[in-house]
């Protein structure tokens, strides 16, 4: 459904959060007006009705329906820049078609209200209001001065908040920590949680959403500050023995948390003194501990990787369960979305949809499995962004899509809002009882020439095609992960069209050669469920010498177990993986042979076999090479064969030992050149006479010019019709003509001499 033009916030907005009322329909805004659009479900299918404008303001950033029974007057919170107004809507008792709207509350704030700064209590008319600095609870919207502020510890900025499902706990996202408060409805108090007041999730919080009774879902953004420059000054790792014996540790130098390679976080002991290092540390006295090293004072350092395997290389979806004894978490990475600031939850299917105001990808995760698999992707157009998400039913996801005009990425936007063409889109979610595990749990990754982790192959049931789903496979490097990249690697082999292609080594592609003896492309295939690996021998995984049928169906992705007890593979599962991997290897071999055959056929087809003439009737020309203008030098004559009427210049140069060749054409000389194939760019006829000479000799230029002058002056005396005369014949003609001229002019010259 097209809604038209709207001016909405660029980031942090979920325009469909608490935006649907069972009676009044969808509340949405174009930035100034408050508009209601009727929505009904007819046999499970949503039907949109008429729209009506119920209010107009200078700025409208968000609309939120309050809780309550359908037959009671509805409460609508309208979020503006620095204040919030609460309106009551009800139908006229006499005329059901007439809607009565009245304001019951106006809440002003010293700071701008957050994009999702209005959070209604799930069961009661209690409203939580959020700014960047304050979080307060309005326990009665009919009274303006009944707010209770939350005691926010620390100096971080507030970004979002949510009530848990039972309504007893308010969780506020401040920086990278969750601040938990217990709401006492009887005494109207808001107190910090006693057993877990502050819980750090390890990443900057973008959005929170209540899921089950004591559980919330948290989305954290990609830590660009840590990637770009957190530990830029410390680029190397020092051996542990040297580090402990010779100089202060990395953590004591930096005074911050350190993330090790295995993903564990080393928290500094608060009781240990933090030694501030203000001068350079002398390391020249430390000798290398490498066996067989020389005595030179050199350190063997290696680049230190703070991100790979530490969970800091992507945004994350985290489930936090608040319990009295322990606060537990589950974590999965969100590939392709840098700032996941939109979330929606469906309690029936226990699925969470995650999106971003700045990315055209929507991911759907299932919370029923312990691995939090990504079950579907929704791909929007390149210039479209999701501006709101909510579940209509357990299978229908309502999306507010904003289409943005092209903006120059070189210039950062200067305002919090932007103009969009907005529309409502309904997407059906497909649920299958299918095995799946998360492709990005614990940062595991697959390699083409290394090992392929089959335990982390996700199962995607979406019909949407997303660029991330294809994956980028590079030899000797990790594959860029996506929720469906590994399953696609197996799925596409099933289709007959994919049998025409296979993965080739990059060096073969560069040289455009395919070897007949294919080495195994996969050296070892490991099943690694959460850092617990069950290795399969490389001998059983080697490619079979006998090619298998290309019609063979591979059933690897659909038979992967759905859950792993204690994250370990049983022997039966390991043998099952081994059999399927052998099938996969055999099909790879067959595909490689097919590619080899196709390559050879293409090479053979490109060869244009010329039709050569018979040896009894060869096609050749006679070439005469003129030497120096002296009686001792004689011209050299050779017959050279033609190639389809073309003459190869290098052959002429080699025969007559010439570096630069020029050919006689009438009374002129033409310097010969060669084309890209080495032929003279001229065609010759069989038995043609050609005269050439060395064009690099300077003696030719003077003598040839005099010779041409002599030939042209005696042209009337010559009786020969030949176009090319050598020097000897021209001199003979000159003598004859000169003697005749002297004989004819002698009588006339004598009288004149006498005079």
UniProtKB/Swiss-Prot annotation:
Record's keyword annotation contains Membrane: no
Note whether Coiled coil occurs among the keywords: yes
What are the recorded GO MF terms, alphabetically?
A: kinase binding
WD repeat residues: 55-97, 153-193
| Top-level taxon in the UniProt lineage | Eukaryota
Record keywords? Coiled coil, Repeat, WD repeat
Coiled-coil spans are: 576-604
Q: Which InterPro entries does the entry mention? A: Quino_amine_DH_bsu (IPR011044), WDCP (IPR028041)
Under which name does UniProt file this protein?
Answer: WD repeat and coiled-coil-containing protein
Source organism of the structure = Gallus gallus (Chicken)
This chain is encoded by the gene named: WDCP
